[in-house]
Amino acid sequence: SRQWLFSTNHKDIGTLYFIFGAWAGMVGTSLSILIRAELGHPGALIGDDQIYNVIVTAHAFIMIFFMVMPIMIGGFGNWLVPLMLGAPDMAFPRMNNMSFWLLPPALSLLLVSSMVENGAGTGWTVYPPLSAGIAHGGASVDLAIFSLHLAGISSILGAVNFITTVINMRSTGISLDRMPLFVWSVVITALLLLLSLPVLAGAITMLLTDRNLNTSFFDPAGGGDPILYQHLFWFFGHPEVYILILPGFGMISHIISQESGKKETFGSLGMIYAMLAIGLLGFIVWAHHMFTVGMDVDTRAYFTSATMIIAVPTGIKIFSWLATLHGTQLSYSPAILWALGFVFLFTVGGLTGVVLANSSVDIILHDTYYVVAHFHYVLSMGAVFAIMAGFIHWYPLFTGLTLNNKWLKSHFIIMFIGVNLTFFPQHFLGLAGMPRRYSDYPDAYTTWNIVSTIGSTISLLGILFFFFIIWESLVSQRQVIYPIQLNSSIEWYQNTPPAEHSYSELPLLTN
């Protein structure tokens, strides 16, 4: 209907992002189950390594560009930023709509790329020469490149919109230092997107012309260099991983201070500086993804130490969350369970990241399952736990309905066991030398792969249970009476759900 197709309302567009992200998340999860099914036993299950790598590549692209980013930035960002700023809507409401509607075509292009020729079995990094015209003939990689172009344009437009909204549409009394931490996290994320995505666009456009227009940007035969592609890709790729986690940081700050009964997060100014520092440092560490391509020892030393420095602002955030929790009598609501799980498991993922930052160690661990375990701890148990925490926390505000708390707690326990059982054994596999992106492995790795596959099955059951919980809530229509006690953030002063046009008059915020 016209309401959804041509919407200029930040709440409706945010809801569209949530639905799209949930749908894409189902596709991405299905692909991950295929990966674990293939690896659950030595020997072939699905086919050859090409089809396996097409599945791995699509799993990564869908989870990153069509699940985490649309939900965190498009869903939570659109819904909460205007409400937290006291703004009537986003700065550019129609551009907001276009940002969303670029995503379904982008996802379609990605899905089509796997259905023509042999698919794009390049890994999400799309390194040439594997992604170049000889090793990947046909249209698959070209379609994947166009998919990334559209998703990138969508994110850049969204970033411009968020930055403009935050600069121009803050309500009276909301100075930058008093702005909610979630809004800060989104605006820093938007800056990272704005600065990193054009570099990715340049890299994949050069790859496109190498494949189709006979250029040789990445072909040594014509004076090009495939390592140039790696530098360009990771100059985008590393900020991207901070783009995926920063909005989560913002949400966790709100949930922890709210559930602790505190009026603000411990050291909120320090939290802002920490996020700014993470955003800045994220741009100067990219070559730690390239320790095995033969860089000078002094270059490796720089990237090792610069990478470790990111642990400092990250540590500030972790300890400030713990300080916010300090001295509180917690009631273990589902939202705080996810937030506590986030703090613990994100820390585990961060510690394995510090291990990998050592270039000499990384030369051994690069392209093994240790790296897979590391980034799934910070994504599958960082970003996804933050999404779960945020969804449960703000669901009563968005819908005016309640979820079944007892079921939500059971669901948390199922997921917690599932994801840890899936990814913790992968540290052992990596230390034992099992390489990434292979569909088969020697018998010695069988035991931990079986454990990992069982864990992924438990996680799948947990996700299905969660969708049932949402269905039950929507069907039962239990209206919220009081959404929350002791509001620490102004979005809770809205009706539940908020009026279609909140803040028709400019609110004045005082101390």
Swiss-Prot record:
Q: How is the cofactor bound?
A: Binds 2 heme A groups non-covalently per subunit. Binds a copper B center.
The places in or outside the cell where this protein is found are:
Mitochondrion inner membrane
Q: Where does Fe(II)-heme a bind?
A: H59, H376
The cofactors it requires, by name, are: heme; Cu cation
Which GO biological process annotations does it have?
A: aerobic respiration; mitochondrial electron transport, cytochrome c to oxygen; respiratory electron transport chain
The GO cellular component terms are:
mitochondrial inner membrane; respiratory chain complex IV
> Which residues of the sequence carry a binding annotation for heme a3?
H374
- Recite the UniProt keywords alphabetically: Calcium, Copper, Electron transport, Heme, Iron, Magnesium, Membrane, Metal-binding, Mitochondrion, Mitochondrion inner membrane, Respiratory chain, Translocase, Transmembrane, Transmembrane helix, Transport
Classification via Pfam families = COX1
Q: Where is this cross-link: 1'-histidyl-3'-tyrosine (His-Tyr)?
A: H238-Y242
User: Which Enzyme Commission numbers does its entry carry?
Assistant: 7.1.1.9
Residues binding Mg(2+), per UniProt: H366, D367
| Reaction equation(s) it catalyzes | 4 Fe(II)-[cytochrome c] + O2 + 8 H(+)(in) = 4 Fe(III)-[cytochrome c] + 2 H2O + 4 H(+)(out)
Q: Which residue ranges traverse the bilayer?
A: 15-35, 54-74, 100-120, 143-163, 181-201, 232-252, 266-286, 303-323, 336-356, 378-398, 412-432, 450-470
Q: What GO molecular-function term can you cite, just one? A: metal ion binding
- Hey, which pathway is this one from? Energy metabolism; oxidative phosphorylation
The keyword Transmembrane helix belongs to this UniProt entry's keyword annotation: yes
Q: Please list the residues that bind Ca(2+).
A: E38, G43
Quaternary arrangement and interactors, per the entry?
A: Component of the cytochrome c oxidase (complex IV, CIV), a multisubunit enzyme composed of a catalytic core of 3 subunits and several supernumerary subunits. The complex exists as a monomer or a dimer and forms supercomplexes (SCs) in the inner mitochondrial membrane with ubiquinol-cytochrome c oxidoreductase (cytochrome b-c1 complex, complex III, CIII).
Q: Which family does it belong to?
A: Belongs to the heme-copper respiratory oxidase family.
Query: What is the protein's given name?
Result: Cytochrome c oxidase subunit 1
Species, as recorded = Drosophila melanogaster (Fruit fly)
